[in-house]
Amino acid sequence: MNQDKSKETSELDDLALPRSIIMRLVKGVLPEKSLVQKEALKAMINSATLFVSFLTSASGEIATNNNRKILMPQDVLNALDEIEYPEFSKTLKKHLEAYELALKEKRLKLPNVSDVDNRKKAKIDAHDTTPLDEEKDELEEERIAEDIAQNEVEQNIDDVEDLEEVNDTLDANAESPQIETIHLTDATGNPIEDSSESDSEESLQLNDSS
């Protein structure tokens, strides 16, 4: 017997409502500077937990009798009447109406789903399409600039090669100058060999002139 009672107490403690919430409810009802013993607060917490469990069970039976698996607010209100708490039913109904009104106002303040989707789509289009076009333009400009730079490099290479060929020709001419061969002949046209410099100057003639 004691074991069963201890088990029930343990299960009730596991399902107990938060102590802070119950304490706020107690302070909101009792006069100021009222004191609550620890055992009294514990009893209130257990009572609140039992009441919620009892009300849930009664509401579930009403939903089942109406062939529904979903528990509706009206089921809870009807359950309060069945467990003989009609005054709670009236108060709870007012709170539910205020809650539904607040939800309705909140929905009206929220933007339309289609408008949100359109704005998101516009942002995606602006984010994805524009950068792609700009990227294509930038790539085209870079390609043109590279072509121009490549042409300039090739032209410079050709100019350097031409200049090197000219320099090579000049260097070759400087290293091996062309010497015109002159044949010395006498008055009759016979070649003169081993003649002195003075004699050579007097009888110097080009073969072409003969």
Curated annotation (Swiss-Prot):
DNA polymerase epsilon is a heterotetramer consisting of cdc20/Pol2, dpb2, dpb3, and dpb4. Heterodimer consisting dpb3 and dpb4. Interacts with the replication factor dpb3, cdc20, PCNA and rfc5; the replication licensing factors mcm3 and mcm4; the FACT complex subunits spt16 and pob3; the CHD1-type remodeler hrp3; the SWI/SNF chromatin remodeling complex subunits snf22, arp9, arp42, ssr1, ssr3, and ssr4; the histones H4 and H2B; the histone chaperones Nap1 and h; and the histone deacetylases sir2 and clr6. Interacts with dri1. It comes from the Eukaryota. Residues 121-140, 147-210 are annotated as: Disordered. Residues 131-140, 155-168 have a biased composition (Acidic residues). The keyword Zinc-finger does not apply. It is found in: Nucleus. GO terms for molecular function: chromatin DNA binding; nucleosome binding; protein heterodimerization activity. This is DNA polymerase epsilon subunit D. InterPro entries: CBFA_NFYB_domain, DNA_Pol-Epsilon_Subunit, Histone-fold. GO terms for cellular component: chromatin; cytosol; epsilon DNA polymerase complex; nuclear replication fork; nucleus. PANTHER family: DNA POLYMERASE EPSILON SUBUNIT 3. Coiled coil: none annotated. Disruption phenotype: Decreases H3K9 methylation and impairs heterochromatin silencing; simultaneous disruption of dri1 exacerbates the effect. It holds the Pfam family CBFD_NFYB_HMF. Gene3D superfamilies: Histone, subunit A (1.10.20.10). Transmembrane segments: none annotated. Keywords: DNA replication, Nucleus. Residues 121-130 have a biased composition (Basic and acidic residues). One of its GO terms (biological process) is heterochromatin formation. It comes from Schizosaccharomyces pombe (strain 972 / ATCC 24843) (Fission yeast). As accessory component of the DNA polymerase epsilon (DNA polymerase II) participates in chromosomal DNA replication. It is required during synthesis of the leading and lagging DNA strands at the replication fork and binds at/or near replication origins and moves along DNA with the replication fork. It has 3'-5' proofreading exonuclease activity that correct errors arising during DNA replication. It is also involved in DNA synthesis during DNA repair.
